[in-house]
Amino acid sequence: MLFRSSTENLIRTGNFVDTDFCYHELPEILDVYDYDTFNKNKEHTDFYVVCSDVEKGKPVYAKLHDMKRDIGYIQASASLPYVSKFVELDGRKLLDGGCTDSVPVEAFRRLGYKRNVVVLTRDSGTGCRVLVSGRGRAL
């Protein structure tokens, strides 16, 4: 089996998901990611991920400059507590950004972005609400 996502994997590696497969084998060998196109287009679009610094309990907003070099931030932003090991980058232990700032609209407004796109990953009928400029708004 190419992809392992299991309790066995969690015990063996400390991660429920096979991170070597997800962040190295898949984008570098099996379904090669077009890093050159990403790097050419980054001058037109900023790409950020949100991670949580587990020692400070604060969000980390990482701007990706080179997808291959910065893949650790993508991994950290998807590393869920209890089923993933910390991802250590730049002297910090990082996990999923949802732990500290699940919908970082205000953070990006502080960075100067006036419009933000938020993609819901669940049925809109779940009652999920997002605080936008002091008002609760369903997105």
Language model regions located:
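Patatin-like phospholipase
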Residues: F3-L139
